């Protein structure tokens, strides 16, 4: 029994897809356990970029099983489109498995997402308008439609009619918006269900059987710890649990079967959407990092907010997700800066604090306390070992490890597979 969980430790976009793809080479099963097509994974293979939103990064290994777990909310239309995209690129998807217990995103979820966001005005959360939140709302309210329901024509029709009656009353009376007709959805989405039917199964059985047989299973998180609905910057969060604990709920695998948790972070910080961001940069340094790092959302295309590395955020993520190993990405983006900074603590009303406050009002008053380190001017994109890094870059990497309190297992100096350097094999230490 060998399993590794990959989680983002910041606000998403840390490069989880790349690290998952990298670790997938030694895994036999790769599974997603939460989120939906609001997540964006960019994988570079032979200098070619592939962008995925629903399907696990392991799909590029035809000999490995890729799983969409029960904790994922699935937009059938997006999934069918993504499958077609992969097929056009010559990628087989015969190794994909989809949980019959996963909940389905339907057009009324997307419409409600948009109407709710518009109604918030200046207090908007910054949702991707993908229907993720409303789908999880229906799940919690026990009125959601699952993949198993989508495949049964009669059950799908019955539940869709019931849900539309309720949602349309909401659209018309609360939002003064046009209703959605049953005929606009039913045949189209039932058709999508039939297209994905061959992939649908009880994925909990597949995952547990694999673990019991001693196979290596990799769990792939979406978004990041700071977007977790319980442990993140609530309410500026996603509607699921990206933390490692979400694996057990979202995949049907017990906590005793989790061996390692790899936390993925960038050498700086970024986030998309609204919400607190203590180390955010508004100057030319921030603009430089954004452009060199290509900091634009995979899903939304929106410019990401960027800032210095925040070890307070990282220690919070380490604690609530039980991180055992760190994967540090995008060190190359900081090349050319005379000075680099790391936030080591916050100043809250004149008092130094080392933890991340739950209160948004307190966070607004938090000022980062920085430790400054000398930068480096060398091009490090071809570096293949820690020793080959310039001394200042090497010191920066080591200082991050010290402040976070987790050993760094890999560091990357670019988007390519060959630009990921191993300091310690995650699989070998299990």
From Swiss-Prot:
Residues binding substrate, per UniProt: 298-304
SUPFAM superfamilies: P-loop containing nucleoside triphosphate hydrolases
Function: Plays an important role in the de novo pathway of purine nucleotide biosynthesis. Catalyzes the first committed step in the biosynthesis of AMP from IMP.
Residues the record marks as active site: 13 (proton acceptor), 41 (proton donor)
Alphabetized InterPro entries for the sequence: Adenylosuccin_syn_GTP-bd, Adenylosuccin_syn_Lys_AS, Adenylosuccinate_synth_dom1, Adenylosuccinate_synth_dom2, Adenylosuccinate_synth_dom3, Adenylosuccinate_synthetase, P-loop_NTPase
Pathway of action: Purine metabolism; AMP biosynthesis via de novo pathway; AMP from IMP: step 1/2
Cofactors: Mg(2+)
Record keywords, A-Z: Cytoplasm, GTP-binding, Ligase, Magnesium, Metal-binding, Nucleotide-binding, Purine biosynthesis
EC numbers: 6.3.4.4
Intracellular or extracellular location(s): Cytoplasm
GO cellular component: cytoplasm
Cofactor, how bound (note): Binds 1 Mg(2+) ion per subunit.
Organism from which the protein derives: Streptococcus equi subsp. zooepidemicus (strain H70)
Gene Ontology molecular function terms on file: adenylosuccinate synthase activity; GTP binding; magnesium ion binding
Family: Belongs to the adenylosuccinate synthetase family.
CDD domains: AdSS
Binding-site residues, GTP: 12-18, 40-42, 304, 330-332, 412-414
Residues at which Mg(2+) binds: 13, 40
Gene: purA
Any GO BP annotation: 'de novo' AMP biosynthetic process
Catalytic activity: IMP + L-aspartate + GTP = N(6)-(1,2-dicarboxyethyl)-AMP + GDP + phosphate + 2 H(+)
Protein name in UniProt: Adenylosuccinate synthetase
Location, primary (coarse class): cytoplasm
Description of how the protein assembles with itself and partners: Homodimer.
SMART domains: Adenylsucc_synt
Binding sites annotated in the UniProt record for IMP: 13-16, 38-41, 128, 142, 223, 238, 302
Domain of life: Bacteria
């Amino acid at each position: 029994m060998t399993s590794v969980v990959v989680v983002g430790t910041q606000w998403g976009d840390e490069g989880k897809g790349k690290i998952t793809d990298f670790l997938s080479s030694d895994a036999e099963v790769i599974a997603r356990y939460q989120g939906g097509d609001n997540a964006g994974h960019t994988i570079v293979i032979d200098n070619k970029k592939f962008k995925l939103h629903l399907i696990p990064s392991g799909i590029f290994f035809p000999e490995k099983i890729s799983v969409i777990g029960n904790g994922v909310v699935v937009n059938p239309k997006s999934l069918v489109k993504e499958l077609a995209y992969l097929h056009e690129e010559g990628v087989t998807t015969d190794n994909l498995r989809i949980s019959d217990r996963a909940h389905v995103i339907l057009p009324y979820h997307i419409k409600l997402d948009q109407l709710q966001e518009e109604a918030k005005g200046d207090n908007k959360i910054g949702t991707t308008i993908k229907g993720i939140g409303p789908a999880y709302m229906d799940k919690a309210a026990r009125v959601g439609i699952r993949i198993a329901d989508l495949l049964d024509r009669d059950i799908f029709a019955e539940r869709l009619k019931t849900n539309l009656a309720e949602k349309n009353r909401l659209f018309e009376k609360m939002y003064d918006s046009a209703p959605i007709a049953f005929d606009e959805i039913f045949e189209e989405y039932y058709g999508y269900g039939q297209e994905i039917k061959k992939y649908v199964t009880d994925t909990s059985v597949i995952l547990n059987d694999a673990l019991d047989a001693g196979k290596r299973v990799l769990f792939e998180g979406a978004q990041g710890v700071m977007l977790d609905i319980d442990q993140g910057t609530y309410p500026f969060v996603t509607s699921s649990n990206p933390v490692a604990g979400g694996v057990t709920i979202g995949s049907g695998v017990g906590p005793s079967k989790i061996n390692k948790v790899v936390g993925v972070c960038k050498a700086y910080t970024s986030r998309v959407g609204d919400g607190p961001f203590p180390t955010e940069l508004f100057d030319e340094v921030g603009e430089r990092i954004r452009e060199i790092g290509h900091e634009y959302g995979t899903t939304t295309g929106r410019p990401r907010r960027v800032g210095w590395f925040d070890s307070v955020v990282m220690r919070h993520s380490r604690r609530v997700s039980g991180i055992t190993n760190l994967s540090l990405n995008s060190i190359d983006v900081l090349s050319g800066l005379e000075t680099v900074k790391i936030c080591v603590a916050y100043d809250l009303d004149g008092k130094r604090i080392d933890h991340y406050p739950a209160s948004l009002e307190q966070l607004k008053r938090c000022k980062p306390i920085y430790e400054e380190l000398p930068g480096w001017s060398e091009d490090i994109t071809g570096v293949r070992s820690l020793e080959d890094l310039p001394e200042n870059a090497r010191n920066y990497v080591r200082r991050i490890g010290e402040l976070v309190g987790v050993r760094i297992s890999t560091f990357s100096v670019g988007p390519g597979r060959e630009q990921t350097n191993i300091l310690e094999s995650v699989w070998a230490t299990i």
